[in-house]
A protein has these predicted regions:
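Hydrophobic pocket/interface hotspot
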Residues: 49, 60-61, 69, 85, ...
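Sec-dependent N-terminal signal peptides
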Residues: 6-11
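Positively charged n-region of N-terminal signal peptides that target proteins for export
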Residues: 1-4
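Short beta-strand edge/turn micro-motifs at domain boundaries
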Residues: 142-166
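A short gly/proline-enriched turn/hairpin at secondary-structure junctions
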Residues: 32, 64, 70-81, 95, ...
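C-terminal motif of bacterial Sec signal peptides marking the signal peptidase cleavage site
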Residues: 13-16
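Short, low-complexity N-terminal intrinsically disordered segments enriched in polar/charged residues
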Residues: 18-59, 63
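Surface-exposed, charged secondary-structure patches
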Residues: 86-137
Length: 166
């Protein structure tokens, strides 16, 4: 029994001490390549969207999305056109007067092999964001938000967003 515990402890220690090198640069995609990157044009695009959202810069935010981009938030069962979502954001921000701070988001872009033609060339962007909002009355709220983006040819095709709506 002691030997089994010692072997398990040794194996755990060995695996805990070895960490794979983080891949930080890959912008090419083919049917057999996979990558996860923390920098590059797709990450810059996500940063641009989050910065524009936080600043209420709706025109800049709109330029990041394709003309046919769709948006789902939380348990939406039907996608909303991104242009309609941005208009909704604009109206909500105008009425609430919120000042939004995105903090320091964590971004990644994942590329995976596919044989499905509808996903060819798409990269999957992910962002974890701790939003802090302050209303014009001074009330503050925080929301941990996860966003998944489908990105192709320098534009976002869709966003799926998960956050606590309370």
């Amino acid at each position: 029994m002691k030997k089994t515990i010692l072997v398990a402890l040794f194996a755990t220690t060995l695996f805990a001490c070895s960490t794979p090198a983080e891949k930080t640069a890959s912008t090419t995609t083919d049917a057999t390549a996979s990558s996860c990157v923390k920098e590059g044009p797709e990450v810059d695009l996500m940063k641009k969207v989050v910065t524009a959202y936080s600043a209420g810069d709706w025109a800049t935010m709109a330029t990041c999305f394709s003309d046919t981009a769709k948006s789902w938030h939380n348990n939406d069962t039907v996608a909303m056109k991104m242009s309609d979502r941005i208009e909704m954001f604009k109206q909500l921000r105008a009425s609430a007067g919120d000042v939004v701070d995105a903090g320091t988001p964590n971004y990644e872009v994942v590329t995976v092999p596919t044989t499905d033609s509808q996903y060819e060339g798409i990269k999957w962007g992910h962002a974890w964001i701790n939003f802090k909002s302050t209303s014009k009355t001074g009330e503050t709220s925080k929301s941990l938000t996860f966003v998944s983006f489908g990105i192709k040819d320098g534009k976002i095709l869709y966003e799926q967003v998960i956050y606590d709506a309370k």
